[in-house]
Amino acid sequence: MSTEQTFIAVKPDAVQRGLIGYIISKFELKGYKLRALKFLVPSRDLVEEHYAEHKGKPFYEKLVGFMASGPVCAMIWEGKQAVKTGRLMLGASNPLDSAPGTIRGDYGIDLGRNVCHGSDSIESANREIKLWFQPSEIQVYDRTIEPWIYE
């Protein structure tokens, strides 16, 4: 079975609103395996490196300040097409453009407070995972439920 990993972060707005459990539940119920989780207030340096591709854009400084303003729940999820499906589960970056049933569609209203981050490519996922987690923090384990999820 071929799987991949994606990086998902519950942003400070969603942490304050008590949405961590809901977001974790969505990924678990989909059948994805949680490989790592940490709860932290990220440093400004970490957030700047994470969003380096957006440096110089009008929203960059506000985004960095927001992401470093409070606790974030950073996670690694694994499964078939985890990056693509994870993004579909989150919904469009602008919550007002997100379909009902998606995380942002159900719980987001404003682009600047869009509840969560999800890797947009396998390459981004690999970079973000290395940025946020040490290899020793990533758990390797078998789930007995796997045959009930994958052929």
Swiss-Prot record:
User: What's in the GO CC field?
Assistant: cytosol; mitochondrial intermembrane space; nucleus
InterPro entries, alphabetically?
A: NDK-like_dom (IPR034907), NDK-like_dom_sf (IPR036850), Nucleoside_diP_kinase (IPR001564), Nucleoside_diP_kinase_AS (IPR023005)
Required cofactor(s): Mg(2+)
Instruction: Report the active site residues.
Output: H117 (pros-phosphohistidine intermediate)
* Keyword terms of this UniProt record: ATP-binding, Kinase, Magnesium, Metal-binding, Nucleotide metabolism, Nucleotide-binding, Phosphoprotein, Transferase
Q: Which GO terms describe its molecular function?
A: ATP binding; metal ion binding; nucleoside diphosphate kinase activity
Q: Give GO terms for biological process.
A: CTP biosynthetic process; GTP biosynthetic process; UTP biosynthetic process
Q: What residues does ATP bind to?
A: K11, F59, R87, R104, N114
Quote the catalytic activity from the record.
Answer: a 2'-deoxyribonucleoside 5'-diphosphate + ATP = a 2'-deoxyribonucleoside 5'-triphosphate + ADP; a ribonucleoside 5'-diphosphate + ATP = a ribonucleoside 5'-triphosphate + ADP
EC number of this enzyme: 2.7.4.6
Q: Which SUPFAM superfamilies match?
A: Nucleoside diphosphate kinase, NDK
Q: Which SMART domains match?
A: NDK
Q: Give the EC class as a word.
A: transferase
Q: Which Pfam families match?
A: NDK (PF00334)
How is the subunit organization of this protein annotated in UniProt? Homotrimer.
Protein family (similarity comment): Belongs to the NDK family.
This molecule's function is given as:
Major role in the synthesis of nucleoside triphosphates other than ATP. The ATP gamma phosphate is transferred to the NDP beta phosphate via a ping-pong mechanism, using a phosphorylated active-site intermediate.
Protein name, UniProt field: Nucleoside diphosphate kinase
Gene it is expressed from: ndk1
